[in-house]
Amino acid sequence: MRMAVTQNPWQGRVDSGEVGDTTRLFRIVNTLESSEAKTLGGSPVLLGFGCDAGVLRNQGRAGAAHGPDAIRQALANVPAHGLPALYDAGNIACEHGDLESAQLALAGSVHNILSRGGFPLVLGGGHEVAWGTWQGLRAHLDARNDDGRLLIINIDAHFDLRTSRPASSGTPFDQIANACAERGQPFDYVCLGVSRLSNTPALFSRAHALGVSYVEDVDMQERHLASRLAELAARIDATDHVYLTIDLDALPATVMPGVSAPAAYGVPLPVVEEIALLARRSGKLRAADLAEYNPQYDRDNLGARVAARLAWRLLG
């Protein structure tokens, strides 16, 4: 189920004639094998989820399976700016559309990274990635007998609370809600950037029934940023652990064309970036992922560079 990164995306510019620190990420990244006993000391670890089977099940457009390596290529040439270490754990493949096995493999890899003291940043792949990442984080907390509160922050145009099965990119947070209920644990879910035009009344009803906190895209613009950050900071202060997942289709299509479902309105990039920084600087962010980047529909690699920028913000 684990596959190597293809065609070595970790290549970039060497500024041999310049004076001073010209180190770029491709110069510091190291591969990480799941069998290694290395202790990671909080270092970020990239993990690809090369899967769009859930997107296809959700009647979306194929192509997100190629997202992880495209984001790596965009990251490779980014200046390291003092980042001491970066690891790459390769990609999880989805073979023959077997989404469930791919999600279990992802969960195992996330758990492995966390158990070794790393910070997993998962590169999707469709938003079905969230079910795998959450399972891996939950398994890690269980192994430590840690019953602290876990806050899920999802920046997304969609609730992804569909109750239909088989599971898809539209069901991960319903699956998480059901798992929390079975375990007798709270389902602390905040969804930021919800589009009223992309979610049916049934999905809003489901969100209300589950006690989901959400903010619509019209209230996630730059003029609202200070209020949103204050509200989110209060939520983070009241929890023990944070899982951040960013569905890139929350961004306006002018900024993020490379997704299955481009947003006509969307949440501005500066707002998304500030939320990511708030989560990272809280000291409570345990895992994060970037979902739905689809290079097949990108324009001039703009979406890849935007995804890489958000990834870079989460690395340090």
Swiss-Prot record:
Pathway: Amino-acid degradation; L-histidine degradation into L-glutamate; L-glutamate from N-formimidoyl-L-glutamate (hydrolase route): step 1/1. InterPro entries: HutG, Ureohydrolase, Ureohydrolase_dom_sf, Ureohydrolase_Mn_BS. Binds 2 manganese ions per subunit. NCBIfam families: hutG (TIGR01227). GO terms for biological process: L-histidine catabolic process to glutamate and formamide; L-histidine catabolic process to glutamate and formate; putrescine biosynthetic process from arginine, via agmatine. The gene is hutG. Mn(2+) 1 binds at residues 127, 156, 160, 247. Gene3D superfamilies: Ureohydrolase domain. Its cofactor is Mn(2+). Belongs to the arginase family. Catalyzes the conversion of N-formimidoyl-L-glutamate to L-glutamate and formamide. This is Formimidoylglutamase. Keywords: Histidine metabolism, Hydrolase, Manganese, Metal-binding. One of its GO terms (molecular function) is formimidoylglutamase activity.
